[in-house]
């Protein structure tokens, strides 16, 4: 009860927001997104509000939707709102506002204002605590940013399981990567649901943003895929259940997401999830259909492409090809479904989707009200959308639907015709025919039924099946519905008077055609049909009804079977009837039918042609009955004069000579009739057959007859067929088709677009094809063909069809080239005038398009160009008054435009003209150059008037000129009059425009002109380079690069040649050019700089110009790294003599710049000019850049290669130039000694210059320079040598020999020079030489060593030379080894003296101190045997002194002492330590520790034999060290060691002793141990209790380590100490400060001794009995909390280990008996004290029992019976802590035994 209440109270406290808990409030207030905790904690809400409100106001400017929060969470009132004071309803209302704000601000969290605004929500409303889920999800899309890390740091520690994934990242303060989030969404249902819930909510609020929606889509898609993968099972039913569960969780999210069409990214994300589900799970067909419908209904223009891909994936998973109707209709409603499906199929396999569309198109054929679906179906097959396999499947679907169409009722004639055409397309197409044949062959389609249903013939179908198969099929056929009889009956009462060709819309005709189509295939039905009153067959010879009906059918767009049947009906009638009339009215329709694609149709038409021909042959002239239907063929309203009829005799000639000879070819080839008519009407024969040409009159009569029919026939299907035939003939019998068919063009023009579309659609004639044939009636033979065509669209009428206008202009383009040039000029002028009309009509656009598309003559282009200057002149009146322009400050006053429309018109006119010129291959019209330059001048003039750049116009004019100039360059001479060239205008284009295109074109033009007419260009060229430097060179596109290259290649050589011709200095003459390029350096893209400058220098001449470019770059950019790299690249391409000559000129320029009256440097570097820099600074920059070039160029390798070549004078040139450069450098240094910066820079050059020499050459040069009297130069030279040696100098044999020989020069300097700095430099060089080359010949180094060790070097008073000398000796010791011995005496004596000097009080010298120790380190390593005992003593004593001084670094000293311990003979080391131990102790703890480390290292690094040999001295040292505690305590207040120092040193001593023990055997060590025991126990007088206590403490601390380290090996040694330990236990106490350390050491040594007993030592009663009672009695020391803690921590582990070691029930009983005494305050009824009087003692005893129970378990609990009474008593103990602990013990016992103690305790 009590504990439960306590838990509840603690939970309430944890969740409490007590306002009096100020610390908690401060912590909460300091949690911030943007401020450090300390800063945040110091801010008040006014300050925070001001900062955050500023961000909020900026947000409002970005998005006005934030303004609503200004009245709520960002109001002034919000500063005093405290959530803890608000009730639940208010908090809920606040949460809603906060979540709305967070949703809106989520997309802007990477912006600073948004973070500031959210900071207010954190600080004031603590959203991270109260709205944790919404806050985390708002920030989660940015989980990789520092902002999210800031949020993690302030989130509560107890995150809900939803976000448990964030806990490890919160603790380690790192951003969570994406993978764990995906894993969490996959495995953590609450997280998955929360993410979806948040995304849908935010999207509904129209606050969805890219970061969230892409994050959500990616995470959810991957997690759903992961869920489905992990749900897989070997048992299908279980896997299905698992998948269904997942899908049921996801589908509501998809429904909500797909419903929000306007949130495009959310919808696309839902598509991704749908795809994942489809690919990972096996879905029911209904589920797939539902998903597909949801997708199709959700897409918008923005998401449709993704939606189609999703549909394609879903469709692939369907078992069949059917699509839901909604999906099918949605796809058909798309703006351009075929293109979109094509894009979809590129992204994903879409075969099932496409076949589903095919199936949808042919579904319910009888119910389709229009042909939209079938039109779409045809387009699908024509668009190559389907692959080969899908094509076969699609064809099979179409054929199956066609085969079964009769079962669902008759389909419409249009549908029948559509399908028939499609099937014919399958059989006729080259690409589709093989697939179609294969499909038909592999399937069991009823071909006969298909042909019957479609009224067509499948020409490429395989042979019919065997007779018996057909019979079987027939037997199985269902009884079909007979639709013919009702249709016939409905027509019985109908009648029609007139021709069925008279008009398009005849109601009875449509009914007749349907009935006729139903009757095909049964002769009796056709006979019945033919006798209908509406056909009036009885009067067929006189009235037109009968024949005109069938003519209209066979010449219309009907199925092949229907048309063939109609032809048969006509043929049958003509064969059986007695006709005495001229049937030429049928001829145009028969001729059209002979061009039909179907062979069956052509065959029947050929038959009719034969019949008509034979009738005419029999007549031998005009028919007695006249021409059949002469007045009624096209209706009563058509006057006979409108139709031109051919006389019978002439027609007979046409039949005999032209038409009938080719009957067989007509059937075979549908194009043959066209060729026959073309040849006949032109007056030539088709072949060399017997047919002869017709006379002109006959041809004219026949041609006009056909043309009149084409014009007047009201039906457009035959009209189109006739036009296709007639448009092959341009001219016949003296007339043209333009003349004969012109009225057709006019009548079509008068028809508006919709009307034209309607009339064509009625007969299924393509409008575009009809318009194309109509405009083809205008031939180029017509002189004014362009004018005729233009007259049909100009003036423009809004009723004109855009496609007709397009066809007219298309025809213009086709005939243009065949029109005479004078007519082209006239037409071009007309078209141009119309093009400039201010209208957006198709007429204007068409005229422009024609002019742009056709090839305009040069004269026309010139005429156009002349319009520009004249028009600009006319515009002068629009500008400001001339006086205003003259007095204007800039001379460019903006125009005061009176008529802006006129200005716009002018600009458009100029643009159009220049575009025409540009697109007309101006290079082929060089005569345009004059006009173009005039245009350029006009444009410049006009540009200054209107203050407009007119970049596009300029680029057009320049581009055309450039094309002309480039052609002239190719040919080699100008193709135009060069006097018209205006170079100033071209240069002006470069200078005054900001357009890169204009600049590039102008530069290329200048380059081209400089080749063909240099004398006219070069005087204007320099401003170009000035401008290039500031503008053009910075461009980085490939074209601009090419322009710059060409300009340099072509202009620069011409410029240089011009300067030379004028005998001017080329360098100074081109300084402006060079300055332009150097000034442009920083603007030039980095990767192009080197190539550009290299090209420039190459064209200018490397020998003459490289130094100038280098100096100008160095002057302008100083030590800019990029510039230096460029300069290095430029010199690397030159050979060694050129490079050196360049440097010599460069140094000459430096010298010139420092003169009182500079020369060329004034021109190149601006020295002495008003805006020039100080000469001194210029010189420094140039010299430092030169030093860089020497160091980083390839000059050294070039010189080496040159010297390797013996022949030629190049080596001599190099030596001469090098000497010259050296002299120039030294001269600058000598002359400028008063200018320190110049002197230093010249020194750098000298150093770098020497770096280019080989080592041998370098030394030769140095040796000469060292003979000069200038000490500064000599020091500089030696420093250069040292620097060279510090790098990686040459190691070849000549170099080594020369370097060692050079030592004598250096030794001489050390011996003789009074200049300490020079000596220092010489010793530094000796040091380097000895280090690098000394081992090759040590004998040459010995003299140097002696000199360095002598008085003249380290014996000097100057510390610099001393330090350098000592370091040099250290290097020599390493290199020379024993060869160093001759110099050793001086070295040792002087170095020890120097070490002593460095340690003198007040004169400490750390550098000298470290140098000496470096020397001794080297000596200890290489010459340890030469260090005497006295030297070792001095080293140790001085080291102790060094250790006492904190100013010295200990590293060098300790390293030397370690090396002494390792390398010097062990006996010498131990002896020195023994002799100087007292000095070490006097020096203090640091020295003592270092001394012990020397002993430790010596023992460790030397062999066992050495330790055994030196055992007496080692033991002596250790005994001295062990006695340190006693000695220091004896000194009292004079002690130099703190107790902590003593403890630390004793730890070291113990480690050293253990190391020593490892190197000894038992027989060797045991005497030492007994001696140590005696030393500790009896070594001091009994009166000296303090001394005895100190030695015991030290000894016992050693024993603690001894038993703990050596463990079971030394357990037996405990027998030596038992008695003494018992004695100590009786005296020592943890409560006594003097004995506490001893007591602790005793407890710990006993624990270690017990713990590692493996020899049953402590099981022995003799050992156990002695120690048990004294040890357990230590529990009695637990009398108050402090001692109780010590006893529990130290004594109990020892007692426990003893019990473990005792390992027997008897021993345990003995221990427990003693132990239980301390569990009772008295021994029973006697009332005698038992030992447990103090509750702390009883508690300690209880803790012991607990420890023993835990360690020994049931072994110890075997003693439980005797413990039970004690337990019962203790459970009633008066001390609460005792009672608490005994209950713990009882619980522990019960856990071990597995049963309750309640019964035992009652």
Curated annotation (Swiss-Prot):
InterPro entries per UniProt: ARM-like, ARM-type_fold, BP28_C_dom, HEAT_type_2, HEAT_Utp10/HEAT1, U3snoRNP10_N, UTP10
Recorded topology in the membrane: Multi-pass membrane protein
Record carries keyword Methyltransferase: no
The entry's keywords: Membrane, Nucleus, Repeat, Ribonucleoprotein, Ribosome biogenesis, rRNA processing, Transmembrane, Transmembrane helix
Location (main, coarse): nucleus
Pfam families assigned to the protein according to its UniProt record, in alphabetical order: BP28CT, HEAT_HEATR1, U3snoRNP10
HEAT repeats: from-to residues: 581-618, 1046-1083, 1253-1290, 1297-1335, 1758-1795
GO biological process: maturation of SSU-rRNA from tricistronic rRNA transcript (SSU-rRNA, 5.8S rRNA, LSU-rRNA); positive regulation of transcription by RNA polymerase I
UniProt-listed SUPFAM superfamilies: ARM repeat
Locations listed in the record: Nucleus, Nucleolus; Membrane
Family, per entry: Belongs to the HEATR1/UTP10 family.
Described function: Involved in nucleolar processing of pre-18S ribosomal RNA. Involved in ribosome biosynthesis.
Assembly and binders: Component of the ribosomal small subunit (SSU) processome.
Protein name (database record): U3 small nucleolar RNA-associated protein 10
Originating species: Aspergillus oryzae (strain ATCC 42149 / RIB 40) (Yellow koji mold)
Taxonomic path: Eukaryota, Fungi, Dikarya, Ascomycota, Pezizomycotina
Name of the gene this protein is made from: utp10
């Amino acid at each position: 009860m009590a504990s439960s209440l306590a838990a509840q109270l603690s939970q309430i406290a944890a969740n409490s927001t007590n306002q009096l808990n100020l610390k908690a409030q401060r912590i909460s207030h300091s949690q911030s997104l943007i401020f450090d905790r300390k800063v945040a904690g110091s801010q008040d809400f006014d300050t925070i509000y001001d900062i955050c409100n500023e961000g909020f106001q900026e947000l409002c400017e970005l998005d006005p939707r934030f303004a609503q929060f200004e009245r709520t969470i960002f109001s002034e009132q919000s500063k005093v709102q405290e959530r803890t004071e608000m009730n639940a309803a208010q908090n809920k209302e606040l949460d809603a506002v906060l979540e709305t704000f967070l949703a809106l601000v989520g997309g802007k969290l990477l912006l600073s204002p948004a973070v500031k605004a959210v900071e207010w929500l954190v600080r004031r409303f603590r959203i991270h605590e109260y709205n944790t889920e919404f806050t985390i999800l708002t920030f989660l899309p940015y989980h990789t940013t520092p902002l999210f890390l800031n949020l993690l740091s302030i989130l509560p520690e107890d995150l809900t399981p939803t976000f448990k994934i964030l806990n490890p990242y919160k603790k380690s303060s790192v951003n969570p990567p994406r993978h764990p989030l995906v894993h969490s969404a996959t495995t953590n249902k609450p997280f998955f649901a929360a993410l979806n819930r948040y995304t849908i909510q935010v999207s509904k609020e129209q606050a969805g943003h890219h970061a969230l929606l892409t994050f959500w889509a990616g995470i959810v898609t991957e997690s759903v895929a992961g869920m489905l993968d992990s749900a897989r099972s070997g048992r299908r039913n279980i896997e299905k259940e698992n998948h269904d569960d997942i899908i049921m969780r996801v589908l509501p999210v998809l429904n909500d997401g797909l419903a929000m069409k306007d949130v495009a990214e959310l919808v696309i994300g839902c598509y991704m999830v749908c795809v994942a589900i489809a690919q990972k799970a096996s879905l029911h067909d209904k589920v797939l259909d539902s998903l597909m419908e949801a997708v199709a209904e959700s897409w918008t223009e923005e998401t449709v492409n993704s939606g189609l891909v999703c549909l394609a994936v879903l469709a692939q998973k369907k078992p069949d090809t059917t699509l839901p109707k909604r999906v099918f209709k949605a796809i058909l409603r798309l703006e351009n479904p075929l293109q979109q499906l094509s894009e979809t199929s590129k992204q994903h396999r879409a075969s099932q989707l496409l076949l589903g569309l095919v199936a949808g198109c042919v579904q319910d054929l009888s119910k389709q009200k229009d042909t939209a679906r079938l039109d779409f179906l045809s387009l699908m097959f024509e668009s190559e959308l389907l692959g080969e396999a899908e094509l076969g499947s699609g064809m099979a679907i179409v054929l199956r639907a066609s085969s079964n169409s009769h079962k669902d009722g008759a389909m419409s004639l249009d549908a029948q015709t559509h399908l028939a055409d499609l099937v014919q397309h399958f059989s006729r197409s080259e690409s589709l025919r093989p697939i179609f044949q294969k499909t038909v062959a592999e399937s069991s389609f009823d071909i006969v039924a298909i042909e019957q249903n479609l009224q067509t013939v499948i020409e490429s179908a395989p042979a019919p099946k065997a007779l018996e198969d057909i019979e079987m099929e027939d037997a199985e056929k269902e009884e079909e519905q007979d639709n013919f009889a009702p249709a016939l009956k409905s027509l019985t009462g109908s009648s029609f008077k007139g021709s069925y060709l008279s008009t398009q819309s005849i109601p009875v005709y449509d009914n007749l055609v349907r009935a006729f189509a139903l009757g095909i295939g049964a002769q009796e039905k056709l006979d019945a049909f033919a006798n209908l009153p509406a056909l009036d067959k009885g009067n067929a010879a006189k009235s037109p009804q009968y024949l005109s009906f069938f003519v209209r059918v066979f010449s219309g767009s009907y199925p092949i079977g229907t048309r063939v049947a109609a032809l048969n009906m006509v043929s049958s009638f003509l064969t059986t009837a007695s006709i005495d009339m001229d049937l030429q009215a049928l001829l145009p329709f028969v001729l059209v039918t002979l061009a039909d694609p179907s062979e069956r149709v052509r065959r029947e038409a050929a038959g009719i042609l034969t019949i008509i021909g034979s009738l005419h042959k029999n007549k031998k002239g005009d028919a007695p009955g006249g021409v059949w239907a002469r007045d009624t063929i096209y209706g009563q309203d058509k006057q006979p004069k409108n139709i031109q009829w051919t006389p019978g005799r002439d027609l007979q000639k046409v039949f005999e000579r032209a038409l009938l000879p080719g009957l067989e070819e007509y059937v075979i080839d549908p194009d043959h009739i066209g060729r026959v008519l073309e040849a006949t009407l032109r007056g030539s024969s088709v072949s060399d057959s017997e047919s002869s040409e017709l006379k002109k009159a006959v041809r004219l009569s026949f041609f006009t007859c056909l043309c009149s029919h084409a014009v007047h026939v009201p039906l457009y299907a035959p009209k189109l067929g006739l036009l296709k035939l007639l448009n092959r003939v341009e001219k016949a019998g003296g007339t043209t088709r333009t003349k004969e068919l012109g009225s057709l063009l006019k009548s079509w023009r008068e028809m508006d677009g919709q009307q034209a579309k309607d009339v064509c659609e009625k007969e299924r004639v393509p409008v575009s094809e009809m318009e194309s044939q109509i405009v083809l009636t205008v031939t180029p033979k017509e002189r004014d063909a362009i004018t005729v065509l233009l007259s049909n669209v100009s003036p423009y009428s809004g009723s004109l069809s855009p496609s007709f206008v397009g066809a007219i202009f298309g025809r213009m383009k086709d005939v243009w080239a065949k029109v005479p040039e004078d007519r082209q000029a006239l037409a071009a002028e007309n078209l141009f005038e119309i093009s400039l009309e201010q209208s957006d009509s198709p007429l204007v656009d068409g005229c422009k398009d024609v002019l742009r598309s056709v090839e305009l003559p040069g004269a026309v282009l010139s005429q156009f160009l002349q319009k520009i200057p004249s028009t600009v002149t006319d515009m002068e009146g629009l500008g400001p008054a001339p006086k205003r322009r003259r007095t204007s400050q800039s001379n460019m006053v903006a125009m005061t435009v009176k008529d802006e429309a006129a200005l716009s018109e002018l600009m458009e006119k100029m643009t159009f003209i220049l575009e025409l010129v540009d697109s007309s291959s101006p290079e082929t019209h060089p005569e345009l150059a004059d006009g173009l330059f005039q245009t350029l001048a006009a444009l410049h003039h006009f540009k200054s008037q209107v203050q407009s750049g007119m970049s596009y116009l300029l680029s057009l004019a320049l581009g055309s000129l450039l094309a002309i100039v480039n052609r002239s360059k190719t040919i080699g001479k100008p193709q135009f009059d060069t006097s018209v060239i205006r170079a100033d205008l071209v240069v002006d284009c470069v200078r005054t425009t900001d357009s890169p295109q204009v600049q590039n074109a102008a530069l290329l033009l200048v380059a081209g002109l400089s080749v063909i007419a240099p004398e006219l260009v070069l005087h204007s060229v320099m401003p170009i380079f000035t401008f290039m430097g500031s503008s053009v060179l910075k461009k980085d596109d490939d074209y601009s690069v090419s322009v710059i290259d060409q300009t340099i290649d072509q202009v620069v050589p011409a410029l240089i040649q011009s300067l030379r011709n004028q005998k001017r200095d080329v360098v100074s003459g081109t300084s402006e050019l060079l300055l332009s390029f150097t000034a442009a350096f920083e603007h030039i893209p980095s990767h192009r700089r080197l190539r550009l400058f290299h090209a420039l220098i190459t064209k200018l001449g490397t020998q003459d110009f490289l130094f100038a470019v280098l100096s100008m770059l160095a002057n302008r950019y100083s030590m800019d790294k990029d510039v230096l790299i460029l300069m290095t690249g430029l010199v690397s391409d030159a050979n060694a003599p050129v490079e050196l000559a360049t440097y010599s000129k460069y140094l000459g320029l430096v010298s010139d710049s420092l003169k009182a009256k500079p020369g060329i440097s004034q021109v190149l570097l601006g020295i002495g000019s008003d805006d020039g820099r100080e000469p001194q600074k210029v010189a420094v920059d140039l010299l430092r850049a030169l030093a860089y070039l020497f160091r980083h160029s390839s000059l050294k390798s070039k010189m080496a290669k040159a010297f390797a070549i013996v022949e030629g004078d190049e080596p001599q040139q190099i030596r001469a130039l090098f000497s010259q450069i050296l002299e120039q450098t030294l001269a600058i240094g000598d002359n400028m000694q008063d200018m320190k910066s110049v002197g230093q820079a010249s020194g750098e050059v000298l150093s770098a210059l020497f770096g280019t020499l080989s080592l041998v050459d370098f030394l030769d040069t140095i040796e000469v320079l060292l003979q000069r009297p200038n000490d500064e130069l000599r020091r500089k030279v030696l420093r250069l040598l040292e620097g060279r040696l510090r790098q990686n100098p040459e190691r070849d044999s000549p170099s080594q020999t020369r370097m060692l020989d050079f030592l004598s020069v250096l030794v001489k300097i050390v011996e003789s020079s009074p200049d300490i700095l020079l000596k220092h430099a010489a010793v530094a060089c000796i040091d380097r030489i000895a280090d690098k080359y000394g081992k090759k010949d040590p004998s040459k180094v010995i003299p140097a060593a002696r000199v360095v060790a002598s008085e003249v070097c380290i014996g000097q008073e100057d510390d610099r030379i001393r330090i350098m000398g000592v370091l040099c000796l250290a290097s020599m010791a390493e290199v020379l080894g024993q060869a160093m011995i001759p110099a050793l005496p001086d070295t040792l004596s002087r170095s020890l003296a120097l070490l002593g000097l460095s340690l003198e009080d007040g004169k400490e010298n750390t550098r000298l101190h470290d140098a000496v120790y470096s020397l001794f380190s080297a000596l200890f390593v290489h010459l340890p045997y030469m260090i005497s005992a006295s030297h070792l003593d001095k080293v140790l004593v001085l080291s102790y002194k060094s250790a006492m001084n904190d100013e010295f670094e200990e590293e060098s000293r300790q390293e030397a002492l370690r090396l002494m311990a390792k390398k010097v003979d062990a006996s010498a080391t131990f002896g020195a330590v023994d002799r100087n131990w007292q000095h070490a102790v006097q020096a203090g703890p640091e020295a003592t520790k270092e001394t012990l480390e020397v002993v430790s290292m010596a023992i460790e690094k030397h062999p066992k034999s050495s330790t055994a040999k030196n055992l007496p001295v080692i033991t002596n040292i250790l005994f001295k060290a062990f006695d340190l505690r006693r000695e220091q305590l004896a000194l009292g207040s004079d002690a130099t060691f703190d107790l902590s120092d003593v403890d630390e040193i004793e730890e070291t001593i113990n480690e050293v002793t253990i190391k020593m023990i490892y190197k000894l055997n038992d027989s060797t060590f045991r005497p030492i141990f007994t001696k140590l025991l005696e030393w500790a126990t009896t070594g001091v007088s009994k009166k000296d209790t303090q001394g005895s206590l100190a030695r015991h403490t030290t000894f016992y601390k050693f024993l603690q380590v001894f038993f703990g380290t050596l463990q079971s090996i030394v357990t037996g040694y405990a027998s030596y100490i038992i008695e003494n330990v018992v004695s100590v236990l009786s005296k020592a106490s943890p409560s006594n400060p003097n004995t506490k350390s001893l007591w602790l050491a005793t407890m710990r040594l006993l624990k270690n001794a017990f713990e590692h007993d493996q020899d049953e030592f402590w099981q022995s009663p003799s050992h156990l009995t002695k120690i048990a009672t004294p040890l357990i009695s230590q529990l009695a020391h637990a009398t108050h909390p402090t001692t109780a803690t010590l006893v529990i921590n130290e004594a109990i582990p020892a007692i426990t280990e003893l019990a473990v070691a005792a390992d027997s029930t008897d021993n345990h009983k003995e221990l427990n008996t003693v132990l239980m005494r301390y569990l009772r305050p008295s021994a029973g009824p006697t009332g005698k004290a038992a030992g447990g009087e103090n509750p702390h003692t009883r508690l300690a005893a209880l803790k012991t029992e607990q420890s023993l129970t835990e360690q020994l378990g049931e072994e110890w609990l075997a003693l439980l019976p005797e413990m039970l009474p004690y337990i019962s008593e203790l459970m009633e103990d008066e001390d609460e802590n005792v009672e608490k602990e005994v209950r713990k013990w009882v619980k522990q016992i019960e856990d071990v035994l597995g049963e309750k103690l309640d019964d035992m305790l009652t």
